[in-house]
Amino acid sequence: MTLSREAATQFAKVLSEALPYIRRFVGKTLVIKYGGNAMESEELKTGFARDIVLMKAVGINPVVVHGGGPQIGDLLKRLNIESHFIDGMRVTDSQTMDVVEMVLGGQVNKSIVSLINQHGGSAIGLTGKDAGLIRARKLKATRQTPEMTKPEIIDIGHVGEVTGVNAELLEMLVQGNFIPVIAPIGVGENGESYNINADLVAGKVAEALKAEKLMLLTNIAGLMDKQGNVLTGLSTAQVDALIADGTIYGGMLPKIRCALEAVQGGVNSAHIIDGRVPNAVLLEIFTDVGVGTLITNSQR
């Protein structure tokens, strides 16, 4: 494709403006949780793969953790296996866990790996069971209604929480010029499999690697105030206040708590970004504009 002089000039300007950011992040690790609309639109999927390859090409080390809830739901439906959710968590019995492993560790993971490699990257697909990458234990879930005097412990099956990350494996892959793509399946002490929220896995991976950034792709423009305005930059103290006054609630709470834990655990910053925007990851890294909410570990 031949660019016009005007287009070529604009292209050169964009590259020039990105240079300070490239210099700043060369050699740094960025953990990106990939999910939502960005995984469903063919255009956005291709754009994401190209963005990841570009990051690696300029010396930044991306590590991808992906979700796949809709794809799991589709296969369960085709197999006539009912899905049940409690407080937003999929109840995962042994039969459902088999499907989760098939979809996340197989179909979804390999399609992402293939697309990145198709655009010039060297991606390698992993689940948390590979070399004990994501160690886990059964999540103890509770539920309480106003009528209860104490919380009720509920069994949601093979749903887990992260207890450890094999950072050495990921560092070896990154230094070998590979792009790790991780399915959020954990392994227990006895080799049992656990279905883990992808945001939580991404956060723990970012902490273990002391990543420069944790980036969570979502289907919203970012965190919003009660008037619907996007909050572009927040400290951990401000986030705590927004949770306390009810501005942040419901399905966003686990994502935000994951971001808070990451920055409090040594990650330089966490970003809640709009995955519906083309090239969202590059816009957030290489421009002042951004496409979401930045959270830093500040008390101001």
UniProtKB/Swiss-Prot annotation:
UniProt site positions, description: Transition state stabilizer: K33, K255
Residues binding substrate: G68, G69, R90, N195
Pfam families for the chain: AA_kinase (PF00696)
Catalytic activity from the UniProt record: N-acetyl-L-glutamate + ATP = N-acetyl-L-glutamyl 5-phosphate + ADP
Compartment annotation: Cytoplasm
Enzyme Commission (EC) number: 2.7.2.8
Chief location category: cytoplasm
Record keywords, A-Z: Amino-acid biosynthesis, Arginine biosynthesis, ATP-binding, Cytoplasm, Kinase, Nucleotide-binding, Transferase
Domain of life from the UniProt record: Bacteria
SUPFAM superfamilies in alphabetical order: Carbamate kinase-like
Gene Ontology terms, MF aspect: acetylglutamate kinase activity; ATP binding
Pathway membership, UniProt: Amino-acid biosynthesis; L-arginine biosynthesis; N(2)-acetyl-L-ornithine from L-glutamate: step 2/4
GO BP terms: arginine biosynthetic process via ornithine; L-arginine biosynthetic process
Enzyme class label: transferase
GO cellular component: cytoplasm
Function: Catalyzes the ATP-dependent phosphorylation of N-acetyl-L-glutamate.
Family assignment from sequence similarity: Belongs to the acetylglutamate kinase family. ArgB subfamily.
Name of protein: Acetylglutamate kinase
Taxon lineage: Bacteria, Pseudomonadati, Pseudomonadota, Gammaproteobacteria, Pseudomonadales
